[in-house]
Amino acid sequence: MRLKINKKVWRLEFVKAAAMQSKRNWGECDLPSATNPLMTVRQSLQPKAMLNVTVHEMLHACRPELSEEAVTETADVIAGVLFKLGARITPPTV
């Protein structure tokens, strides 16, 4: 899926753990300076975790200057509220 964030086109992909740079990660995000920036989210996550990780990686893309702690705290709040409001992510099928 292609997304425009801060005037740059990003790809967002939901992938198997084996496709992640580290199999321990739930999500990953390139730096905005990358030629073709990519965000990946593990596709096997439960709905609440998938929403949280997607918001988390999008925050990294939008605000790369934020610390990991700030991104985590902000994603937890935003994703928690969105989840309570009924938001869920349905990854595109390939």
Q: Would you name each region that the model predicts?
A:
Residues 1-48, 64-94:
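Metalloprotease/metallohydrolase-associated module, dominated by Zn2+-dependent proteases
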Residues 52-61:
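Active-site recognition of the HExxH zinc-binding catalytic motif
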